[in-house]
UniProtKB/Swiss-Prot annotation:
EC number from the UniProt entry: 2.1.1.45
Binding site for (6R)-5,10-methylene-5,6,7,8-tetrahydrofolate: 188, 285
List of catalytic residues: 161 (nucleophile)
Protein name (Swiss-Prot/TrEMBL): Thymidylate synthase
Gene designation per UniProt: thyA
Record carries keyword Cytoplasm: yes
Pathway annotation from the record: Pyrimidine metabolism; dTTP biosynthesis
A Pfam cross-reference name: Thymidylat_synt
GO cellular component, one term: cytosol
GO terms, molecular function: thymidylate synthase activity
Length: 286
């Protein structure tokens, strides 16, 4: 059993046994009914990527390829355009969060509002982050924040769930490591937990490669970790499953010091990944 599997089962058990019910819930199911959930607060996990600990479960298949493509959409393309996400990456699940009548920051007609990639572009976040890491790798101000009140007032749209990332550099002997911390306001435990974690591990790996550093530790804090009320059967099924004996790890197959913007989704490879099947079905809360 991997560390991620252990944490996954512990979180499911804690939510089901100790979680409290949501009140005045915003999300809806596709039939229009309120998507209530049981939740816990203050969830934290630590993974040492340098030792092969990756935040991906083997208890069910995780769509890692499309998840990583979303990272490129946000941080390389730096757009909120659904057309780019579909035409360039063949990713469609953000369509449920389209904000009608709000054009994308690149002029395309369809967007998710002034969110995610649009905020990255607006503040030139990636270029600023890379520049200050270049100037002083040991500075303590390496923060990506997608929480933009001005953008929230400008258009409608889902407010970012994974909204803040921080990076720190450590020297251990002759090696330099990049650590990453992801802060998330809200997380759908069964559907999105490992998707979001692995997305930001991928981002951490891209930044580390840019400088020729090794990836170090990944810290993951979630304020509200929940399971929706139409997912309880799937939760029980996951608790019953025996994890695969594989040890999955994400590999970025480019040379050290490859420019951040030259890395491509196909440069990533998830190796030794043999998750338990069949896949479970989930009706998403929107």
């Amino acid at each position: 059993m991997t560390k991620a599997d252990t944490i996954f089962k512990e979180n499911i058990t804690k939510i089901m046994e100790e979680g409290v019910w949501s009140e005045q819930a915003r999300p809806k199911y596709k039939d229009g009914t309120t998507a209530n959930s049981k939740y816990i607060t203050g969830s934290f996990a630590e993974y040492d990527l340098s030792k092969g600990e990756f935040p991906i479960t083997t208890l069910r298949p995780i769509a890692i390829k499309s998840a990583i493509k979303e990272v490129f959409w946000i941080y390389q393309d730096q757009t909120n355009s659904l057309d780019v996400l579909e035409d360039k990456y063949n990713v469609h699940y953000w369509n449920d969060w389209e904000v009608e009548g709000v054009p994308a920051n690149n002029g395309d007609k369809r967007s998710i509002g002034q969110r995610y990639g649009a905020v990255v572009k607006k503040h030139d976040i990636i270029n600023r982050l890379l520049a200050q890491l270049e100037a002083n790798p040991w500075n303590r101000r390496n923060v990506i924040s997608l929480w933009d009140y001005e953008a929230f007032e400008e258009t409608a749209g889902l407010q970012p769930c994974a909204f803040q990332t921080m990076f720190d550099v450590r020297r251990v002997g002759e090696d330099v490591y990049l650590d990453g911390t992801l802060t998330q306001r809200s997380n759908d435990m069964l559907v999105a937990h490992h998707i979001n974690a692995m997305q930001y591990v991928a981002l951490q790996m891209m930044i580390a490669k840019h400088f020729g550093w090794k990836v170090g530790k990944f810290f993951y804090f979630i304020n509200n970790l929940h399971i929706y009320d139409n997912q309880f059967e799937q939760a029980e099924e996951l608790l019953k499953r025996q994890p695969s004996d594989c040890q999955p790890r994400l590999v970025l197959n480019v040379p050290d010091e490859t420019n951040f913007f030259d890395i491509k989704p196909e440069d990533f490879e998830l190796v030794d990944y043999d998750p338990v099947k069949p896949q479970l079905k989930f009706d998403l809360a929107i």
